[in-house]
Structures are given as C-alpha cells and as structure tokens.
Amino acid sequence: MNSFVIRNGFGLVRTFNTRLFTTSTQNLEGELKTILGQAKVSKLQEKLKLDPRSKITFNDFKGIAKEVGIEEKEINSVSNALAQSGSIIYLPNSLNENLKTSVFTKPAHIYQSLEHILDIENKGVGLNKLIESKKSEINSLRQKIQPLEEKKQVIDRKAHRRATAIIWTGLGYCFAQAAILARLTWWDLSWDIIEPVSYFLTFGSVLIGYTYFTMTKTEFTYEALNHRLFSKRQDKLFKRNNFPKEDYENLVQAIDKKEKELKELELATKYDHTH
C-alpha cells in the first residue's frame, strides 16, 4: 500500500501518497548533503586565503581539506573543481615534478607576475625571445660588473687580512699579559701585590666589552668583532681606491632582479609546454 489517510477533527479526510513523501525526503537529504559539501569547500577556500603561503604541496592541501571535513575520496574532485574555477592553480598532469606536486593558493599573484614579466600590453613577443633578451641583459650587466668585482675581491682580501691581524694581535696581548703577571707574581713580586692589579685588569676587560656593546649595539663576540673590523677597513679601502660602491650595489641588485625574472620566464615556458 502506497498511501495513508489522516482524519482531522472536522471529519475531513486527507490521503497522503507514501511514495511521493519518500521521494521528497530523499531529495531533501540530497540537497542538505550538497549544501554541507559547499559549506566545507567554502571553509577550505577561507583557510587557503588566510594561509600566508602562496604555494603549498598537495599533501599540505589534503591536510587542510581534511581539517574542514572533506573526505579523502573527495579531495581530488574538489581540487580539480577549485582549479577550474580559478580559486587555485593545480597542475597534476604537468611534466615538471615540482609543478605536479604543488598547489598555488594565490593565483592572482601568479597572474600578476606573469603579466608584469611578459608585458602583455606589448603583444606579439614570444616567450623564447623574451628569455633570450633577458639572458643578453644579464650578460651585459655581468660584463659591466666584472672589473668592479675583481677590484672588490682585492679590497676584500686586504680588509680580511687587516681584521685577522688585529684579532691575532689581541690574542697575543692576552698571552703577553698572562706571562707578565706570572713573572711578577712568582719571580719579581708576590701575589699580594699582583692580586689587585689582576682584578683591575679583569674589570677593565669587562668594561671594554660593555663599552663596545654600548657604542656598536652588537655583542662582543668573535663574529661581530671580525665583521666590524672587516667592514671598517673595507670602507676605508673603498674611499682610498675610489671604488664606486653605490654603482656596484646597483649592478648587483639589477642582476639579481633580472635572474629572478629569467627563472619566472623559464617556469612560464614549462607551463606553456604542458598545455
């Protein structure tokens, strides 16, 4: 029997079809599941937006998806759906192993970088031509910086030798001080006389270290002292040899920038070959 009857207090009779009732219940359950699934995907998108990283591994993506309640068997379909909608960049079929196992959670940043590098407003320039042009620019900059690099290496060696010599002189002073105190204690004088002298020498060493820390705002360590002595001597040699420090630093920054752009162009070429 596929129906039942309900009689109300006024004697009116109403017949309900159980088949229709069951079907509507099933539809409702399906709609609820769809809504819950969409809510989980929405939570996943929010988590990815809040994540400061612009690139994560697919395993990290799976971990975040599981945190919001998405089941293991649904993760692949969810990732593909998000990739198709443009919410993420995921290339599981890429020939590049790094791209294949990575998820770019901030696709807008990638698109902006590509637009900036490729200069999309100037149409008609191929990626390979851009790469060759970028390599030519880098080679030109390296030729400009080479004589400065050679000159700087000579200056750096001199500055390093001076810093090392001063540090070894300090060590020699410590040994000489210990030898003189030993001589005065056991041969010329006695410990009763040398004790206050050694106390003030120790206190003076601590005072020198504290003064160094106060003046330079750096710890009184071997690394800090060596770096400071090296930098001081290097600056003096730069001035003495008329070394264009500013030009050199600008060239270094320009080369670094061009090399980063070249890497991004080469990555874009690999991406282009997979599509």
UniProtKB/Swiss-Prot annotation:
Coiled-coil ranges from the UniProt annotation: 125-157, 244-270
Protein name stated in the entry: Calcium uniporter protein, mitochondrial
Quaternary organization: Homooligomer.
Segments carrying motif Selectivity filter: 191-199
Record comment regarding domains: The selectivity filter, in which calcium ions are arranged in single file, is composed of two acidic rings separated by one helical turn along the central axis of the channel pore.
Native organism: Dictyostelium discoideum
Transmembrane regions: 166-186, 193-213
Swiss-Prot/TrEMBL GO biological process terms: calcium import into the mitochondrion; mitochondrial calcium ion homeostasis
Topology Mitochondrial intermembrane: residue spans: 187-192
Entry keyword annotation includes Cell membrane: no
Function: Mitochondrial inner membrane calcium uniporter that mediates calcium uptake into mitochondria. Constitutes a pore-forming and calcium-conducting subunit. Mitochondrial calcium homeostasis plays key roles in cellular physiology and regulates cell bioenergetics, cytoplasmic calcium signals and activation of cell death pathways. Sufficient to operate as a pore-forming channel without the need of calcium-sensor or auxiliary subunit.
Binding positions for Ca(2+) per the UniProt entry: E195
Membrane topology: Multi-pass membrane protein
Disulphide bonds in the chain: none
UniProt similarity note: Belongs to the MCU (TC 1.A.77) family.
Any single GO CC term annotated in Swiss-Prot or TrEMBL for this entry: uniplex complex
Molecular function as annotated in GO: calcium channel activity; calcium ion binding; uniporter activity
Regulation of catalytic or functional activity: Inhibited by ruthenium red or its derivative Ru360.
Reaction equations catalysed: Ca(2+)(in) = Ca(2+)(out)
Transit peptide extent on chain: 1-28
Keywords: Calcium, Calcium channel, Calcium transport, Coiled coil, Ion channel, Ion transport, Membrane, Metal-binding, Mitochondrion, Mitochondrion inner membrane, Transit peptide, Transmembrane, Transmembrane helix, Transport
Record PANTHER family: CALCIUM UNIPORTER PROTEIN, MITOCHONDRIAL (PTHR13462:SF10)
Localisation per UniProt entry: Mitochondrion inner membrane
